[in-house]
Amino acid sequence: MGSRRAAGRGWGLGGRAGAGGDSEDDGPVWTPGPASRSYLLSVRPEASLSSNRLSHPSSGRSTFCSIIAQLTEETQPLFETTLKSRAVSEDSDVRFTCIVTGYPEPEVTWYKDDIELDRYCGLPKYEITHQGNRHTLQLYRCQEEDAAIYQASARNTKGIVSCSGVLEVGTMTEYKIHQRWFAKLKRKAAAKMREIEQSWKHGKEASGEADTLLRKISPDRFQRKRRLSGVEEAVLSTPVREMEEGSSAAWQEGETESAQHPGLGLINSFAPGEAPTNGEPAPENGEDEERGLLTYICEVMELGPQNSPPKESGAKKKRKDEESKPGEQKLELEKAEGSQCSSENVVPSTDKPNSSRREKSTDTQPAQTQPRGRVARGPGIESTRKTASVLGIQDKVQDVPAPAPAPVPAPALAPAPVPVPAPTPVPSRSSEQVYFSLKDMFMETTRAGRSQEEEKPPPPSTRVAGESPPGKTPVKSRLEKVPMVSSQPTSSMVPPPIKPLNRKRFAPPKSKVESTTTSLSSQTSESMAQSLGKALPSASTQVPTPPARRRHGTRDSPLQGQTSHKTPGEALESPATVAPTKSANSSSDTVSVDHDSSGNQGATEPMDTETQEDGRTLVDGRTGSRKKTHTDGKLQVDGRTQGDGAQDRAHASPRTQAGEKAPTDVVTQGSERPQSDRSSWKNLVTQRRVDMQVGQMQAGERWQQDPGDARIQEEEKETQSAAGSIPVAFETQSEQLSMASLSSLPGALKGSPSGCPRESQAIECFEKSTEAPCVQERSDLMLRSEEAAFRSHEDGLLGPPSGNRTYPTQLPPEGHSEHLGGQTHQRSEQEDSLSQCPKKEQPQEPLHVGLSGGHSTGLSQEVPAMPSLPGTGLTSSLQEELPGTAASLHTNTDVPLPSRDQDFPSSAPTLQLGPGSPTQSHPPEAMATSSEGACAKEPNVDGRSSGTRSCDPGLIDSLKNYLLLLLKLSSPETSEARAESQEVADTGGLTSSSTLVPTMEVAGLSPRTSRRILERVENNHLVQSAQTLLLSPCTSRRLTGLLDREVQAGQQALAAAQCSRGPCPTPLTIPAIVVGEEGSAGEDSEERTSQESDKKGLLGEVEGHTVESRTQEPCQEEAMPGEALTGLPAATPEELALGARRKRFLPKVRAGSDGEANKAEERESPTVSPRGPRKGLTPGSPGTPGRERRSPTQARKASMLEVPGAEEEPATGDLVSRSKDSGLDSEPAVDEGKQEALAKQRKAKDLLKAPQVIRKIRVEQFPDSSGSLKLWCQFFNIVSDSVLTWAKDQHPVGEVNRSAGDEGPAALAIVQASPTDCGVYRCTIQNEHGSASTDFCLSPEVLSGFISREEGEVGEEIEMTPMVFAKGLADSGCWGDKLFGRLVSEELRGGGHGLQKASRAKVIYGLEPIFESGRTCIIKVSSLLVFGPSSETSLLGRNYDVTIQGCKIQNMSREYCKIFAAEARAASGFGEVPEIIPLYLIYRPANNIPYATLEEDLGKPLQTYCSRQWGCAGAPAAASSSEALQKCQTFQHWLYQWTNGSFLVTDLTGADWKMTDVQIATKLRGYQGLKESCFPALLDQFASSHQCNTYCDMLGLKPLKGPEAAHPQAKAKGSKSPSAGRKGSQLSPQPQKKGLPSPQGSRKSAPSSRATLQASQAATVQLLGQPPVQDGSSKAQSMR
């Protein structure tokens, strides 16, 4: 710190300027609320410098206070018991009591209406006492004037709560009391309005005074400050001084950014030049104003309120943003001019610091979420101390990254920050700072000590400072700073990650170099983030980060462009740093990823990451592994946590240094790049995004695997593609970098037995090397979308998308490999040689290859070799899944993702490709970790890893042994397998495919080897060997299960293959050797794919993964059509025996279909279902059909839930008919073979377009106290209009249309969740291209985890609106006058079929004359509401529509019933007539689901009189002999006839003669405005099943012998029914039948009857109103 500090002596400079450039992003880490911005974050006494953390300016008393505050957990007041309303007669005594808890002890104030009661002088009327936490108000001899609303208000430093009770005395009822109260409120409101109007006039004057006050304090500073909202929020104003303009602009920019995204917590948001100095420009020339500034700050703070002011207004933020943009430009120029600024440049950075400080305040909130100390201290201090030159450069970088971080929420970090959604304003600047400083101090000390101990080098910040004087090591410090910044942004960004949407889509482009690195780490982190995100989303508030991100993306794009401009070197360095950091922390990774997206931030992040990691570790108890890594990691050289690993740093330093040389130049260049560059880069990115989007459609399905997988793969791909596309120059540079990193790596590699550090380093190097060239690509990729990324990843697997695409047979140039590997040329070379000579099987090398395979083409090639390698065995499969499908990681998405982060370090090799040797030894471990989580403890459901990430060498050895065992088993075939794998590689990228989609291989061995093992080894043998490994119980179990399932799957495949050997196209088990055609190769790959997908399914891969992998493989094959035929070895006797050749040549089976379709189609869907293994084709393979259409995981997990045949894809024959039904096959005449072919073709075409599940169903609780839950999930790749359907226990509960491209979350609200709502919920999306679904079991255990409904003591205010049919039935109803009143809800009652919630409520007042006070009534609300993100499908809108429909249905039926009653009374002897009670619409403003219906309480248990078959009413059925039941059936008959079969009441329940819970069916959609009640089948069913009774005869109703009877009956009954005047329909049914469009297409009645019905329908429509639309909600409206 000292050396850094030397750069700028001023406190501002010392703390901020030196590091400012680099750490500006970091610096902002602290970012308290606007109020606290007035503090200079970095200011602290000289002594505090040693802490290496930003300490509070006034660290003395405030620090002590903050420590004490932290020691005691403060809680806001809480009423354990609330006031109970009382009603007494006059002269009675009354006591109100309540029990309040909270710390500090709350102070309770009593109010009568709005008048405070004196706690001491109340006698003789009242007395206020309290004993402990029980507070009492005693009233004596109450009179009517004492009747009022009494309120107890409890407050402490944490908040204020209140409760109230009503005292009724004598005739002064509650109603009157409330009326009196409302009158008072109205008077108050009127007076308030007058005051406001007057205050507007004085407002300007007041603000002027405030300004004057501040100006008096410090005219200079004041002018530089901007005030956010009044004096309280002293914020820097636009700098006045010209010389400060550049720097101030920079800081403003940074500030603006941070302010703009305060919620994002862009700790790194500072503009490149800004050094976060609490908003004060750092004194120029290093003025030594520490003392003065501190004093000034204190004064300002004293003047201003202690509470943190509200966040800056949007307008101000916008203003700041705008200002910051120019600032950025200036900063860029400054950077270009003086990227190597000397300490003199510190001044600008100092100004920047101001902005940083502001950003800091903004960021601080997120940062606070993380351990403040860490975040603040690392970035702030380091950034402050970074050299000016570093500052200049880094400022630029930071500028870019800062914005990016926000857009790229760090999912991993997000968990920690979760509590602090970016939006939440910091409690108070001062307090925040204090806390921050406190934490910083503690964390700094701990960390500093730790880092020092571990690192010998100074603590992260210290080291940064010490590493080089500002001028000396600008790059290194910058890098380090960048990492710090990144981590900070990560934390700040964390909140955004909450949103689990495609991060990449929203992620801003990364800087070129960084983007590459970022993409790698971001892949990992992103997948992590996703896994975390899944949990996080609920944990962390879902911040609408995506939009913000988007904003950033646009805006950040330039910044990021800057970042990319940053300089390949810098970017590379930062990425490198970031990469380790990422590896180090899953959260860091996540963050890094996000940052990576931002690119620069990712780079900045590493340093902070350490800090963050510590913070995370502290804050994030969640990731135990992270903690361990953090604690151990530093020692471990985990490499994952840059901050953690001094080693990492040491390596990073060399790496950085090595990279710095070129990078520095690059950086300078980057800084020199004009903004225009950025725009062009932006355009580039945009173009790329477009391209990617196009590709996304294709890649979408692959994407489908797992968003995380896709991401990882995508990023890997990107990395690969980037590497592939990297220009030679970049390559050279990257090589240099990699060399540098190699030099630094060696120690690290050696240092870390687990190889994790090595891997992470390798990743870094790899990222670096790839990054420089790939940065743009990366950013673009990032921008594109996860899907695009995924696709690119696949491409990468196939070959670098860039066009360096290397066929599996040919490795990329060594340099390229090096790039990819980034770790060492040697390793790359080894890899190259390995890949080149896959036949040579060196278990380790193959492993290495396998690991790297996923990442680079060369690697993927190697991977193919891997499959054959026994050593690769388990690891291989894991690897295959990891690289290929990223499945292993994603497969166990929940586990793998975290494990992935963990793996990243440990499985980094996998990603790294480059680090062959180190990886080789550790690959199995890494692999195991990734797929099995062997190395890492099982991640929590959140996806966070709960265990240590570090891999156990023992585990690795055990895995190796196991793999060797497998090798021995398959040794005879090893060479063959190798050859095969090589061939496979040759075959159209099958190698990569195999990685992506292994055939039925055991642990990734070649199919042949796997087959042999399966044949020779018994299930328990494998399982036992797995069990004998020295693994943790968890891992062991998981591994064993994996092997077990794998073996089972393999055996199944084997059996299927054997069965299909002859007639079927290739069985899955046969090695993926393409003997004849691409098609066959495609088939094989497909088989492989399906098998892999099965395997994945077994592993718990995400639904749709199978499809994805399959899709990927076909794509790959298509991509490299010629490769399939390359160098196939001669068929071995075994192969021939297995029928491999035969298989390959069997494409004729598909040949029946059009030749063209066969290719793609066969590849994608060999025969039947893309998913189902070939075994599905074999006649004797039962059960495959069910699996074929859904993801393997789902098939296995939810097979029990699945409606048999509902989604099954029957077999070949069925397929055709199925496709016919769905309209896919429009040529019924085609012979069966052709039909199959056509079906296959279409399916093959659609595979890429079929929707995919991106997020499975998860449950959340609504924020209000209503007890309602939300189930939500998300689909992507929705390329055409789709229908989204929710079902509970296989009963559809609602559906909603989704337009193409609408990939927002799909949600189902469960209103007032209760045990009756438990069941299996499924969400299915379907369109012409396919369908995807996801299930969730809502069990009582899950339900018990949520807070049950809370009912306020005094109920809730409501608005009630009656429905009026002023014009009779011709009118669809209108609404009467509203009544305002209050209800108290009581117990919940059951709903019919769980589709409706009914609760009894007591009317307090306001609903007369309909409901008298004290009367009970029933509130009903649809219990299941399907909604979505769009305004048309919003929860409120759906709730309103469904409720309105319910009102209309019942009230319209009531009108019909009135007519029926009139006719019935005319019939002598008919007797009493059923009556349908009215429904009233109520609006409850305090409820998230505000609309409901209100009806009278019938006071008796309900009986069912009519019910449609599908949903039996909740009430017991009335006796069939019941008069009421018979009359209800007569009413149905009469109504059916009276409306000519257009309208029918299908459900009635009631007590005695009063009916409710009405459901209807209409023949026409939209009949009478009833949108969702079109069920023509129910009308037909009624007509055929109704049996007339005596009451039907009394009314002269004709028997219904079928639908056709309706018309004649109507005719006969002309006098009584509207059909009387309609002659046309009866006259000539035939012509009508032809001429009229049949509204009831679904009806299956005879033509004549249909014609008549149509005619009568038309007439009815004319008579009764406009046609409606149908909505599943009517169903949801069942009886209570």
From Swiss-Prot:
Residues 1-37, 237-288, 302-759, 785-950, 1078-1128, 1147-1244, 1603-1680 are annotated as: Disordered. Expressed in the heart and skeletal muscle of adult mice. It catalyses: L-seryl-[protein] + ATP = O-phospho-L-seryl-[protein] + ADP + H(+); L-threonyl-[protein] + ATP = O-phospho-L-threonyl-[protein] + ADP + H(+). One of its GO terms (cellular component) is nucleus. Residues 514-532 have a biased composition (Low complexity). GO terms for biological process: cardiac muscle cell development; cardiac muscle cell differentiation; heart development. Residues 77-173, 1251-1339 form the Ig-like domain. GO terms for molecular function: ATP binding; protein serine kinase activity; protein serine/threonine kinase activity. It comes from the Eukaryota. Residues 320-337, 785-796, 1087-1111, 1151-1165, 1231-1244 have a biased composition (Basic and acidic residues). The modification Phosphoserine is found at residues 229, 1199. Residues 402-426 have a biased composition (Pro residues). Coiled coil: none annotated. Its EC number is 2.7.11.1. InterPro entries: a-kinase_dom (IPR004166), Ig-like_dom (IPR007110), Ig-like_dom_sf (IPR036179), Ig-like_fold (IPR013783), Ig_I-set (IPR013098), Ig_sub (IPR003599), Ig_sub2 (IPR003598), Kinase-like_dom_sf (IPR011009). Disulfide bonds join 1273-1323. Residues 9-21 have a biased composition (Gly residues). It is found in: Nucleus. Residues 339-353, 557-566, 731-744, 917-932, 1639-1660, 1671-1680 have a biased composition (Polar residues). Involved in cardiomyocyte differentiation. This is Alpha-protein kinase 3. It comes from Mus musculus (Mouse). The gene is Alpk3.
